[in-house]
Amino acid sequence: MGIKDWPQGEGPREKLLLDGAEQLSDAELLAVLLRVGLKGLSAVELARMMITEFGGLRSLLTASQAQVCRLDGIGPVKFAQLQAAVEIGKRISKENLKRGKILSDPDLTRDYLMRQLGDRAYEVFAILLLDSQHRVIQFVELFRGTINSASVYPRDVVGLVLEKKAAAVIVCHNHPSGIAEPSTADRRITERLKQALQTIDVSLLDHMVVGDREIVSFAERGWID
C-alpha cells in the first residue's frame, strides 16, 4: 500500500503537519523528502530500506552520489534532494554561529562542529577564533589530511590568531573513524598549542574532537587547565 492509500492523518507528511517534525522517525522524515516510493514499496518502506542499507541516516546522507544511486529507484534527482536538505542544515548552523555571536552555549558549539566536521572522510584541523568577549570572529580550517603532532604547526596557529586579532580560541579536529576518543598525539598537540598561545597572551578555551556521533571536550575532562 502506498502512502496515498494510508488513512487520513497517518502519512508522514500529514503526521509532520499535525504533530511536528520531531515526532517522525528517521524513515518517516526521509520519506517526506523522497515524496514517492517504488512500485509495491511506499516511500517510508523505501526510506527504511535505504537507512538499513547504509547502517544509519548519517551514513546515508554523507555517502557519495555513486553509492546512493546504486540503490533501486534512487537517481540523481532524489540524491540532489537529500543533499539540499543536508546543506540547508549546515547553513542554519553557520547562521547560528555567525560573526559577532557570543559563544555562551556549549551545545550550539557542538552542533556547529558536528555539522562542519562530522561527515568528513579525511581529517580536518580547524580553529574557532573569538574576541575578548568570546564573540565569534571566524571559523578556519587550517590543516587537512593525517593530523598528528608533527603536521600541526603552532606557528601557523599563532600567525592566524595575530592576523585576526583573536583573544581566545577553540581548536577542533575530527576522527574519520567515527571514534571521538582523543589519542596521545591529540593531547600532545593541545599542550604545544596551549604553550604557543600563552606566549601571545591568548587563551586556549578547548580542544574538541569530533566523532561520528559524539564530541569529546578537553576542557570538560580537565585537560586544558
Curated annotation (Swiss-Prot):
Entry annotated with the keyword Protease: yes
Protein keywords: Hydrolase, Metal-binding, Metalloprotease, Protease, Zinc
Superkingdom field: Bacteria
MPN domain boundaries: 102-224
Gene3D superfamilies assigned: Cytidine Deaminase, domain 2 (3.40.140.10)
Residues where Zn(2+) binds: H173, H175, D186
Record-level Gene Ontology MF annotations: metal ion binding; metallopeptidase activity
Record motif JAMM motif, residues: 173-186
GO annotation (BP), single: proteolysis
SUPFAM superfamilies the record matches: JAB1/MPN domain (SSF102712), RuvA domain 2-like (SSF47781)
UniProt xrefs under InterPro entries: MPN, RadC_JAB, RuvA_2-like, UPF0758, UPF0758_CS, UPF0758_N
Family: Belongs to the UPF0758 family.
NCBIfam families referenced in this protein's UniProt entry, alphabetically: PRK00024.1, radc
Protein name (Swiss-Prot/TrEMBL): UPF0758 protein swp_2203
Organism, as annotated: Shewanella piezotolerans (strain WP3 / JCM 13877)
